[in-house]
Amino acid sequence: MVLLVVDTQKGIVDERLYAFEKFVSNIRKLIRTAREQGIEVVYVQHDDGPGTGFSIGDDEFEIYSGFAPLLTEKRFVKTVCSAFKKESGLLEYLTEKGEKDVMVCGIMTDFCINATVEAGFEHGLHMIVPAYANSTQDNEYMTGEQSYHYYNEFLWPNRYADCVPMDKALGLLKK
């Protein structure tokens, strides 16, 4: 198993996210537990391209300090919603390692997390989504809360991922 931390970058990790404090706390617990158990933590960062303010070299592109990777932890960069798009190299990396179980956390629920969960499933990976370890902001169609519940409680379970309570997620990391 690997813990995949998606798009937790300075420019978008803030109070605009649904259930912000719980989200931050849960991701910190997941990262800490994975490291304690010797489970690899892998980071993915979204790059909107040069001149956007959200690209390699920009401060907003960097990982939020509360989730900062260790120097030894892998980072992948993507330019589309799915972390598994060929250009990122993530799928090839996991395939070479023989990893099939991916616990995913991060942002945005309705964009990059959804695309990553569905693409991972389509590539034959067992996707695990811990409760309140993904979040998003309000948009013109749904609040962040509505988006969170739609994906975590309706769309992903029994289709694309095992959506599990935090205590179960932590237990899976401890096996």
Predicted features and spans:
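Catalytic metal-binding/acid-base residues of hydrolase active sites
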Residues: 9, 47-48, 81, 108
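Active-site-adjacent betaalpha module
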Residues: 1-2, 29-32, 54-175
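N-terminal nucleotide-binding beta1-loop-alpha1 segment
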Residues: 4-7
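Phosphate-coordination/substrate-recognition cap region in phosphate-metabolizing enzymes
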Residues: 51
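Short acidic, Gly/Ser-rich segments with clustered Asp/Glu that frequently serve as metal-coordination loops
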Residues: 9-15
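A short alpha/beta connector and helix-capping loop motif
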Residues: 16-47
